[in-house]
Structures are given as structure tokens and as C-alpha cells.
Amino acid sequence: MKFGKVIEGQSVAEWASAYFDYKKGKKIIAGIAKNPSEGLYGTSGILGETPEEAIVKRGQIHRFHPLFQEFLDQQANKVEEFFENLVSDARERMDLISDQVDIYEKLRAFKKGTLESGSVVLIQKQHSKLRQRLDSILNFSRLQPAYHIPARKSVPTDAYTPMVSYRKLKSKLKTTLLDFYDYLKLVSQYQHLNQQAFRKIVKKYDKTLHTDLQGFWVDYMSRYTFTDFSITTNWQLHVEDIYARLFTNHNKKLALEHLKSFRQKEHFSANSMRFGLLFGAGLPLAIEAACYYNATEQSSYLLQIWGGFFLVIFAFVLFDLDCYVWEKTRVNYMLIFEFNQRKSLNWRQHLEIVGAVFFIFSLFFFLCMRNFFPGFTIYFPALFLGVVGTFLIAPVIVPYWRMRRYLIIQLIRVFLSGLSTVHFQDFFFADQMVSLTYACGNISLFFCLYKRLWRQPQLCNSSHSPLLGFFTTLPGILRVFQCFRRYSDSLKSFPHLVNALKYIFNILAQMFLSLWRIHPGLKYRVLYTIFAGVNSLFSYTWDILMDWNLLVRKDGRWQFREHRILKQLWPYIIAMILNFIVRSSFIFYCIFPNHIQHSSGISFFVTLAEIMRRCMWNILRVEHEEIYNRENLRAARELKPLDFVKPHSDVFVSHQISSDKNYTDDEDSMDDQTDVDEAQFS
């Protein structure tokens, strides 16, 4: 493989502009070989030599061609400057980690001594709850943040939490050490690739121009610090020592296994095969079940409920497709979503879980529509939901507990929008729910049907149930809360309040659609058409200019942004056109007004198109974040020192021990085994 491809494949995409420009170096060498006299400033004429002889002579006196020398200086200075920034950032991280290690060791020593002396309870039992609350407030006032690293302005960080338990502090410190070790490996890889690029380009220069300057290159590069690997090596050794001392009982070998275990080295062919088997077995069942549909009232409502389940599964499949596209285009979605790259599932593993759920769905759907058990048909959707719910919350008996736990926590965070700081994955997940209005409306339909024991099911549909209309607006309401919270944290009316206005139009459109279904007439039809049209135009403009940032205004003209993941422009143009078409799908409700009362078929296909549009939207939305990271040379997760605390006095230690008095030091030695056990199911 050519070295240009090697450096392109092994480099950190977010640091691409800071690497040695190997392709440009090759072009300069080719230009010198084609026109050797260029840039020699008349040297050949003064010495009475041909240009070729002048180059050879310069090689003999250990000098590069002036154009090539200028290029090397420019590239070396660029790499050196960026490496110094990396070292400075690493030093700040190391100082912060050292402070937290000191806190942790003091806390552990104090806890161990307290447990041995038997004086665990530091707050006397006779103190009232009010006194304990006052003590906690006093402790809060004595705590200060250990360090401050400014975060991205549009994504404010959480306020620090001073009451961090010993167990939580240990977990955070372990994760921080692992992240920092990975960061040092990226820095070391940056050094290695650039040093190798310099060596390769000089070798090519010697080969093309028949010189021998490898020795001079060694002396030339020795003055740059990025050629000195001792800096990163010493830090890596220091992290290894800290990790071994704190978490593996001085077992250096085990510490190295933990630090150097990368999930990316695993193979996922078995996961892909299992997904193929599950999907291949489920798809024929689902198709045959749909063929058994008969136009009875009960079957129509059953099909509507199963349709909602299918759309949710389909949305997860398309998200995995997004992950595949990001992986192929080298978009670091793990960093953007702030996933733990060591513990998070690969998208193929996630797809295997979705395949299992799809197979269960297809099996129950087939049994329901085929009417295998007369009298039990209406209970198959509830049974499916119970099986999947058990599958979701079972921590041990079902594999991949970490992913399922993350999904549960993310759902809770979305439904509690506004109560905590909103991160990228929070509003991204809520945006997926905005595209699932059909499934959200089915929540009301599902519980209404079973509450009424499937008697008079027409009273539960969209023409009779205001609650169904409310559930279709719920995702938009949650997004509005998130926008208000982001405004509260940043105090920036733009873009957060304007974004909230966009979702308010979405809520109003869904509300008037529900009112039109309940009260057929011209008034609500006109109101729905107006607000749905405004929402579509507003959302489409926001997609292009803000979420995707495809069009930028430069020199008084609108043009496509300069930096794009894909070199061709036509995929972005097609995405803009398709996005507009699907955004205008509200028009179908106006075209078929006679079916508006119970238009489950129209709603299903409109939502299906919206989910596919969301899949496309996801790709370009995350690409926008990736471009931001590349422009700002951000390739690693930021340390969040505000999650840690810095004690002002021993009161801090006392409070931590009192909150963790049931956590004995013997459990320290069990943590690594616990990590191994969890890894088997993650």
C-alpha cells in the first residue's frame, strides 16, 4: 500500500489538517525533477553547472533544494506547533488527574482507617434530618471546582456535584485514566505517522533526485520535540503505575490488559451472521402475517398497533445503517455521542439485538394475524410488549446489558427533559421520537383498547380520543423543554429559543390535526394546513442552515459549505430535495380529507417516509458535528473536572465516608472481576 493511503487510513480524522502533507511533498519533488533550476536562484549559472549537477552537489554538501527545504520547514513548524498544543493539553489533563488521584487516595486511606477503628458513623444518629440537611448545605459551600476547562459554548456542561460518593469517584477516576491513556496513544500515533512521513518523503527525494540526505535528515529533525517519544512514553508509564496501584493491587500486567484492551480490534462476523439468521427468519413471517389481514374492525386496530411496533424497530435498523455510513466515511460518531469507546457496543452488536426483537415481533404478529389461538388474538400485542420489556430490563440472563441500560437511562433523560443539562445524545434521541408520532399516538390507543377490553374500539381512535392527539404532540413538547433548558444554561436566545419556536409550530400542527379529526370542518382544516405548512418551511430551512449547515453566506452569496465529508456535491443536493418532499407530506391529509377521522393507513405511510427522512437527516446532522470537531481539531472526549470535587477540609472526607459506609475496602479488589463479568454481557 502506498504511504499516502497509509497515513490517510491511520491518521486521526479530526487532526487531518495538522498532519504532514505527504501528497504535496510528492508534487514538489516531481516539480523539482521536471524543472530542477526552479528555486535555485541562479546557482547553476554562477557555478557553471547544469541544474542536475547543482542538485547533486547540494546533496553532497547535505542541503535540500530550496523549494523542498522551504516545504519541510513549513510542515515541520506546523506539526511542531500542533504537537506542542497536544502536549500542553495532555499536561493539563495530567495535572487534573494527579489532583483527583490525591483526593481518591486520601479518601481511601481515611475510609480504611475509619472502618478499622469502627467509627463509621460520623454523623450522630441523634441529629435530626434538618441538621443533616444543614450539614450538607455547609459542606456544599466549602467545596470548589478543582479545575476549569471551557467547553463548547452551545453545549454547556453540568454544574459540578460536590457530594460524590467513594464508589462514584472511583468509577469516574478509572474512566478518566482509561480515556487519558487512549488520548496519549493518539498523540503517540500522531508523532509516529509524522516522523515516518518525513522519513518517507526524504527517501523519495533521494531516490528521485539521486542524492543521499538521510543522515542530514536525522540531524535536521532532531531539533523538533515531536520526534521525542519520551514525553508521551513517560506519561503512559505514569498512568500505568497509577492504574496498577489504585485498581489492580499493583498488578502491572493486569493493568496493562485493562489499559490496552480496545474494542475496535474485535471481529463482528458472528454478530452479522446471527442478525442475518434472525432477520431472514422473521421477514417471511411478517410478510405472511400481513397477507392474512382481513378488513374486520378488530383486525384494523390490531394492524395499527403492530404497525407502531414495526416503525420503532425500523427506526432502530435505520440508525444502525447510519452508524455503518459514519464508520465508512470515518465520522467519529462515538466521540460525538460521547460513548465510551471501550464499553459501547459496535453497531453490528446493536443490530443483532434489533434482529432478535424483530424476530419476536414477526412471530407474535404472525400468530396474531393467523389467529392460531382463537379468543387470545387480541392479547398478542400485550404479550409481545411484555416479552420485549422483560428482554429490555433483564440485567444478566440477556446479553448486552450495558446497551439496554443506556437505552433505559436515555429514555428517562428525555422524559425528564428540562431537569438536567441537555447533551447532544439527549436532543438527538428526542428528535428521533419526533419522527415517531404514529407510534407515540399508539400509546393512547393501546391502553384505551385494553382498558375497554376491546369493546367499542372506535371510541379509542383519533376521531374520538383527545389523549391520542396529546401523545402525538408529546415528542415536540419534550424538545421544547430541552430548548428552554439549553437557553437557561447558556442564556442565548439564538438558536435555542428560535429552535423552541420551531417545535411549537410542530405541536400546533399536530394539535389542529387532532382537533380536525375530532371536529371535522373547514375551520380546523384551514388551521392545520396553515400551521403544518409553516412548520414544514420553518423546519426545512432550519435543517439546511442550522442542523446540516449545508448553505453558508459568503461574500453576499449563498453557497455550499467548504468542508464536507463527501467530495461529490450531488448527494447533498439530493438530500435537500428529498428532505423538502417528505417535509411536505402533510399535504396528503388535505388531499384525502374523507379519511381524516381514522386515517391510520395515511398516518402509517407518512410516518414511514418521515423515519426514512430522519435516517438521512441523522447522517448529515452528525456530519456537521464531525466537521466542527475537525475544524477545532477535537479528537478526544473532554475531561469533565466539574464532575469531580476538591475538598476544602476534612469535612469533605467525613461526608463521603458517611454516604458510603456500607461500601467496604474489600470490594476494591472485586471491581476488576466485576468489570470482567460485565464485559461478558456488554
From Swiss-Prot:
This protein's name: Protein SYG1 homolog
Family from the record: Belongs to the SYG1 (TC 2.A.94) family.
Alphabetical GO biological process terms: cellular response to phosphate starvation; phosphate ion export across plasma membrane; phosphate ion transport
Listed GO MF terms: inositol hexakisphosphate binding; phosphate transmembrane transporter activity
Keyword annotations: Cell membrane, Membrane, Transmembrane, Transmembrane helix
Any single Pfam family the record assigns to this protein: EXS
Keyword hit for Transmembrane helix: yes
